[in-house]
From Swiss-Prot:
<comment type="similarity">
    <text>Belongs to the GPI family.</text>
</comment>
<dbReference type="InterPro" id="IPR035476">
    <property type="entry name" value="SIS_PGI_1"/>
</dbReference>
<dbReference type="InterPro" id="IPR001672">
    <property type="entry name" value="G6P_Isomerase"/>
</dbReference>
<protein>
    <recommendedName>
        <fullName>Glucose-6-phosphate isomerase</fullName>
        <ecNumber>5.3.1.9</ecNumber>
    </recommendedName>
</protein>
<dbReference type="GO" id="GO:0004347">
    <property type="term" value="F:glucose-6-phosphate isomerase activity"/>
</dbReference>
<feature type="active site" description="Proton donor">
    <location>
        <position position="351"/>
    </location>
</feature>
<comment type="function">
    <text>Catalyzes the reversible isomerization of glucose-6-phosphate to fructose-6-phosphate.</text>
</comment>
<comment type="pathway">
    <text>Carbohydrate biosynthesis; gluconeogenesis.</text>
</comment>
<keyword id="KW-0312">Gluconeogenesis</keyword>
<keyword id="KW-0413">Isomerase</keyword>
<dbReference type="GO" id="GO:0006094">
    <property type="term" value="P:gluconeogenesis"/>
</dbReference>
<dbReference type="InterPro" id="IPR023096">
    <property type="entry name" value="G6P_Isomerase_C"/>
</dbReference>
<comment type="pathway">
    <text>Carbohydrate degradation; glycolysis; D-glyceraldehyde 3-phosphate and glycerone phosphate from D-glucose: step 2/4.</text>
</comment>
<dbReference type="InterPro" id="IPR046348">
    <property type="entry name" value="SIS_dom_sf"/>
</dbReference>
<dbReference type="GO" id="GO:0005829">
    <property type="term" value="C:cytosol"/>
</dbReference>
<dbReference type="InterPro" id="IPR018189">
    <property type="entry name" value="Phosphoglucose_isomerase_CS"/>
</dbReference>
<feature type="active site">
    <location>
        <position position="382"/>
    </location>
</feature>
Length: 545
């Protein structure tokens, strides 16, 4: 057994968690529950009162965090200590949104000047594209950007760009390509004009299979539209560490933006990987995005854990995963622009904390990362919310909503907000059998049917949720929101004693994919894989069933 599960606090939480009354009773016992269980920081407001906790629960959770030396681990990350022990790397995505006056050491050097130089280089490039100064090979300004990446190099820029749609530069559009499925890039290129299209290729090595394949196909398309090899530099730029390969491809060394080993892919949107975001919304808004994240960094680093928003959210997740048997967590965004956030947080959390050994290689004997999923309100209310209300699985929920809409049309936002708050109330409160039966008292149902229907209308409630609010969705509040979930993910990993910053499962998938590709391209049937894989490869080689 691990030391975590043998701790006195862990065992106390196991006992305590099974003894709490229903949340209805917790609210009845404490009229000040909302005021005592809410916190504001960095333009965000968190109501966590609709959780299965009382003062004693929170005390135990914070004790668990202290036993895990959470504060020391937070300091170690911000200081650039090598906390990614399997790859021997610092974890300094926070440095990407630091201020120019700060000093942050990685590998023996202050990395802040290099970060600031990259931002300045981005600003110059973004300004030239947005102003129309940057011309394509026929002298026309850029109208379309195609961002080519995979994983964090794709999902972060895409979701943030989608969320900041009200801030896009007029006349500029962006198209995101990640999947190696040819349909993805073919559909994107179908209606584009090569003369006015700019490609941004993001790959640290300039050799990531999906990204390189898509970039080569984009180049073939570009040349096929009448352009020449010497025109490539006007239409292709890269975010990469491999300047040699990028220049061999035809890119100008002046239009190659750096990546660093101390930034993981799923934390990289704050770096030059965010170039597509900056091209769309402008450098001022990109800087505001960084500033929102920096504000959350400061809150996370400096605030006592009892009032620390990322810590509170993380410890609640630990509570449900380790002491209530929850296997998933749902993110529900009540804002159309934020509809992509569940997928982004899914990658952030599951790639980080989908681990089964501790930092020292011990097999864990407790649950780690949950399945993260979700969608857009109110759509989900007519689908999977049914399972949240009456299913047998406990699924904690995060509701995220701005108080003000970018599109204030009639009563739309009032209805959206009422649905959001109503769902949190319904999950917490539920409906008893007596309440259901009373609601049916004036119905036209046969008296013998009413007890049966009432039974089907019962909802046990006591389903936990957080509500996250902001005045309005802006670059600053979005930056703070994303950083909040980054730090929440870190805290969970710190409690579970796992490495949240490697991804060996992803690496194995890449390795085996390349092995299979060799068999597909061979001049004979596959025989040296497992029986199923051999058969699938050979069936694919035939091209038909």
């Amino acid at each position: 057994m691990t030391t975590l599960t043998q701790s006195t606090t862990w065992k106390a939480l196991q006992t305590h968690s099974s003894q709490l009354p229903h949340m209805r009773e917790l609210f009845a016992q404490n009229p000040q529950r909302f005021e005592q269980m809410s916190v504001a920081a960095c333009g965000l407001f968190l109501d966590y009162s609709k959780n299965r906790v009382n003062d004693e629960t929170l005390k135990l959770l914070f004790s668990l965090a202290k036993e895990a030396k959470l504060s020391e681990k937070i300091t170690a990350m911000f200081n650039g200590d090598v906390i990614n022990n399997t790859e021997q790397r610092s974890v300094l995505h926070t440095a990407l949104r630091s201020k120019a006056t700060q000093t942050i050491i990685a590998e023996g050097a202050n990395i802040v000047p290099e970060v600031q130089q990259t931002l300045a280089k981005m600003a110059k490039f973004v300004g030239s594209v947005q102003s129309g100064e940057w011309k394509g090979y026929t002298g026309k300004a850029i109208t379309d950007i195609v961002s080519i990446g995979i994983g964090g190099s794709f999902l972060g820029p895409k979701i943030v760009s989608q969320a900041l749609r009200p801030y896009w530069q007029e006349g500029l559009n962006c198209h995101f390509v990640a999947n190696v499925d040819a349909t993805s890039i073919c559909e994107k290129l179908k209606n584009l004009n090569a003369e006015t299209t700019l490609f941004v290729m993001s790959s640290k090595s300039f050799s990531t299979q999906e990204t390189l394949t898509n970039t080569l196909s984009a180049k073939d398309w570009f040349l096929g539209q009448g352009a020449s090899q010497q025109d490539v530099a006007k239409h292709f730029v890269a975010v990469t560490s491999n300047v040699t390969k990028a220049t061999e491809f035809g890119m100008d060394a002046n239009n190659i933006f750096p990546m660093w080993d101390w930034v993981g892919g799923r934390y990289s949107l704050w770096s030059a990987i965010g170039l597509p975001i900056a091209l769309l919304v402008g450098m001022d808004n990109f800087t505001a995005l960084l500033d929102g994240a920096h504000q959350m960094d400061q809150h996370f680093a400096d605030t006592p854990i009892e009032q620390n928003m990322p810590v509170i959210m993380a410890m609640l997740s630990v509570l449900y995963g380790n002491f209530h048997g929850a296997q998933s967590h749902v993110i529900l965004t009540y804002d159309h622009y934020l509809r992509g956030l569940p997928a982004y947080f899914q990658q952030l959390d599951m790639e980080s904390n989908g681990k089964s050994v501790t930092l020292d290689g011990t097999d864990v004997d407790y649950s780690t990362g949950p399945v993260i999923w979700g969608g857009e309100g109110t759509n989900g209310q007519h689908a999977y919310h049914q399972l949240l209300h009456q299913g047998t699985a406990l699924i904690p929920a995060d509701f995220i909503m701005p108080l003000q809409s970018h599109n204030p049309l009639g009563e739309h936002h009032d209805q959206l907000a009422s649905n959001c708050f109503g769902q949190t109330q319904a999950l917490m409160q539920g409906r008893t059998y007596d309440e259901a039966l009373a609601e049916l008292s004036n119905s036209k149902l046969d008296e013998q049917q009413k007890p049966l229907i009432a039974k089907h209308k019962v909802m046990v409630g006591n389903k936990p949720s957080n509500t996250l609010l902001m005045d309005k969705l802006t670059p600053t509040t979005l930056g703070a929101l994303i950083a909040l979930y980054e730090h929440r993910t870190f805290v969970q990993g710190a409690i579970w004693q796992i490495n949240s910053f490697d991804q060996w499962g992803v690496e194995l998938g890449k390795q085996l994919g390349n092995d299979v590709l060799e068999r597909i391209g061979a001049d004979h049937d596959a025989t040296d894989l497992d029986g199923s894989s051999n058969a699938l490869v050979n069936l694919y080689r035939k091209g038909k069933l």
